Amino acid sequence: MVAVLNLVCGSFNLHSQTPNFGANVLIFDSSMSMASIQSQLNTVFSQQQNNQFGTQRYALFFKPGQYSNLAINMGYYMQVLGLGQSPDNVKINGSLDCHAFLPNGNATCNFWVSSENLAVSSTNGYTMWAVSQGTSFRRMHVQNNLYLCEWSGSQNWASGGFLADSKIDGSVNPIGQQQWLSRNNSYVGWSGGNWNFVFLGDSSPPPQTWPGPYPSYTVITNMPLIREKPFLYIDSNTNFFVMVPNLRTNSVGTSWAGGPTPGVSVPVSQFYIAQPGVDNAGTINAALNSGLNLILTPGIYHLTNSILVTNPDTIVLGLGFPTLIPTNRNPAMVISDVDGVKVSGIIFDAGTTASPSLLEVGTATNAVDHSADPICLYDLCSRVGGQFIGTTTNCVTINANNVVGDNLWLWRADHGNSGTVGWTINPSQSGLVVNGNNVTIYGLFNEHHEQYQTLWNGNWGRVYFYQSELPYDAPTQSAWSHNSVNGYASYKVASGVTSHQAYGLGVYGVFNTSNVKCFNTIETPTSSQQVNVHDMINVLITAQTGSEMTHIINGTGATLGSAVTTATANNLWLNPTFALSAGLDGSGTNFAITLPTESWHSYRLQYKNAVTDPSWSNLGGLVGGNDTLETITDPTSASSRFYRIVAY
């Protein structure tokens, strides 16, 4: 009784409406002096602007109201949050910008910044959000134009990015952005961009243009399934709550277009508020076991044991990029195989001794169905090396079924503090291993690991937008090969998988230390009838002489051997070519394939009588486009006939 009471009192001041979020959460009110607010913003930014591998983290809260003539500049590990029930409850008049941290407009290292749940009206007519991986822009109302990259400079590059549940009153201009995922947004127009842009459930997206010429757009009409990220807000009595939005299916546009986002409000008194330097796995697990949810305040948490999330519907909310570091060969966090857990806003940083995984979701593969209340992961980053020497086997392992990921960056560092990066210094095998079924990820960024970046063993997996760089630093081809195959595919769907769908995949090569080759950047089963891969691109950015990206998928796609070159593939096939055995066809029965279709594609069966025929012939008309199982038949099939299924 005393222990539980101490936990509750430690996490929430019962005599105050404002919880104790710690020294690194700054809470602003519109009644405060704007000059005082600006001074505090400037102090934080000046510290964080060049603090890529520092230990300081900040969350900046704005209570409902109007804030005039503020210039909010974003630096590393800074999160800006509005505390209204709607983004329009907090309005910033002035600017909220993230400019390129490197010289000459180079934003390719603009990591770990976030802005959520407020409106901004910029005095210069646009909001600049020049960012790369590990960033988020959610529940925002930009009352001007939105730029996703610096528009001036000799190297105006950026490697983003993620925009969700937001309204842009003007247009979105990516400028020099390499790739982006836009989901459940509205805007007047979208123009420009480069290699791989995916639009998912936007209310007025640009037309499909894949494979370009640039920009290359993949457009999917409806968002299949999402529960928007939980968010903090205060009511009219300044009491703090966390809103847990309702689950949406086949959605288009923002969750707040018709008013406050529907959902369930949870008082912050039902959360344990952890503090860096005070709390550890023991105190946090005691709170979770007592039935409390968890808020992690900004800072670094060293964990000799795993944080164990065992209760259904637990909310774990990270503020200001809290960073979990396992120190005893343990995962930083293990989520039990229970319904409805929601984890957001955390960096999982590998310790100096290898963990099996930094985040483990579900402890073993099983048949437990979470489809009515899925486990959800939002805005999560993993990092191996960079700040200090780190190592892990995998970054994230998903064993549970029906998990939804929304904006994940799994990074083996390619640069960092001196002595923290190298093939044998910060090793990790894979960024993501999926063993569960019906796992869906929107926005998967996965880079530089030493074997498969992504290894997918479960069935009915779905990925919408994939960005991956192969490892920069493989010392030799023999060090980066397996079974006499050069390199490892970035995106590997295991041979036993019978159903998988992926849309908008970009894999990039930066081979700047040795002349190595990667035979396939994407590998999928070639005998399955329900494996879909749509809109793929390889880009060889930098290459030592003799390096190459040999193929895109399964031995097909142009070979790239010099920088900067690209190769694309835009057909969706359930398998590139498959043949029926004579025994199956010999009876003269109809050949039939049953496949799951989706509302944004139509499908057609094509055939060749010999694999060497120069072209494919159509069989019948288009089917599908209705989110149901469809059967496609060939009533005249012959024993030598080869088939493929193409999507439009």
Regions found by a protein language model. Name each.
Residues 1-10:
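Bacterial N-terminal signal peptides
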Residues 16-39, 249-280:
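Right-handed parallel beta-helix/beta-solenoid
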Residues 30-79, 85-88, 95-97, 276-282, ...:
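N-terminal extracellular ligand-recognition/capping segment immediately after the signal peptide
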Residues 67-79, 84-206, 342, 347-440, ...:
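Right-handed parallel beta-helix
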Residues 176, 192-238, 351, 466, ...:
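Gly/Ser/Thr/Ala-enriched C-terminal appendages of enzymes
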Residues 305-338, 342, 460-501:
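Long amphipathic alpha-helical scaffold regions
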